[in-house]
Amino acid sequence: MKQKITFILCLLLIGGLRLNAVEVSTFADFKAAVEAGGDVVVAADLENATLSSITLTKDVNISAKSGRVKMDNVLFSIESDINFSIKGIIAFCSSEEKTPSKILVNIPANVAKVSSLTVEDCEVYDYTICFLKALGETEIPTISVKNTVVHDLNTGNPANAAIMLQKAKVSKATFYNVTFYRCQGGGYYSNDATTPIDFSMEKVSFIDCGDADAGFAGSKDIINFAANASSKYTLKDCLISGSYTNKAFSFKSVRLRATTGKFTITNSLSYKVNVYALANPATELYTMPLTATALTVDYDKKAITTTPATIKGIGSSYLSLNGAITGIMQVNLTSDFYITDSEVVSEEISDITVYAISGTPVMEQRDVNNLSIASLNKGIYLVKVATKDGKTSIKKFIKK
């Protein structure tokens, strides 16, 4: 009997089921469970009409029961030394309220240390200030962000980057398969010169970031660091590009700013990447073998002329560069349909599927002429229309 019980426990753990995890389906239960700490499994979308701040003082591991679940109008404030992890959550703010400030994860200035911050398989959007903000000199040994899309941030205050760490003392920051899209204040900002950082980005895409209106003050750098000669910065297979203007794809000058430290940049595509005042250029591993000139873009594909002509595996899986095409996928753009604020309308009987920008299907109807999208939350989506005679088209749209 003891062996049988042990075997069952092993199966539960292998399957990802955590013992003593609290499963929640309402915002009230979610708030109580998260404040209590421990493993919190979210089984349903969390509907919440007003901005709600949740104070965190204990280790907490938040995850979706399956796939991804929505979390509306939630603001986390970390107020003691904890490990914070969030996985499989679509976090956004639908409320028009101006206060409190729309920051997904906020660390007040008086917090001495936060042991770790982990974000995985998430989508974050419509936080008008930041995705993550640290106001003081908080020690943060590790930050990890993986398989995540961050978009439409900083619209209320473009002086803030999506990740705004100011003087926080971060030792290691790792980003893998992440897309930053329309983050007006830039991507990552640190002004701490005292702590050497091991900073790594692999398969990360920056699209239309760091180009807030000239009238706004603040950093326009995509990535910004203060001087520290012992720091190490690695960018591998990354795509950094500019903005959309009248559906034209224009690379803008983007900056990676660090006055000292060692940069390793390999197989990454950008236009006019400026790395300022490297400590010892003779020993830097700084390779930029790729150059690009922009052509045009529509919302189905982005065509870029590159040198060399074919390059592989650059950027996140959500917006990546393969050959000379970057975008969602190459399709036969022959089916005719249009998108209004409330529906997708096809001229032929079709199968219509709506995807989140991460690629997750969120709506589908078969053998129809139209599909209502009125219930979708604000955000970026893709629509695929496939007719019965094999014609297929994909378009991107922004639900406002």
Positions of predicted regions on the chain:
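Extracellular beta-strand/beta-solenoid scaffold signature
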Residues: 51-52, 71-77, 93-111, 125-139, ...
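N-terminal extracellular ligand-recognition/capping segment immediately after the signal peptide
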Residues: 25-31, 37-60, 66-75
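Bacterial Sec-dependent N-terminal signal peptides
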Residues: 1-23
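Beta-strand-connecting loops/turns
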Residues: 37, 59, 81, 378-379
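Acidic, glycine- and Ser/Thr-rich low-complexity intrinsically disordered tracts
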Residues: 238, 257-331
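Right-handed parallel beta-helix
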Residues: 64-66, 82-93, 113-126, 139-154, ...
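C-terminal outer-membrane/trafficking sorting elements
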Residues: 331-400
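Disulfide-bonded cysteine-rich modules in secreted/extracellular proteins
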Residues: 24-26, 276, 328, 339
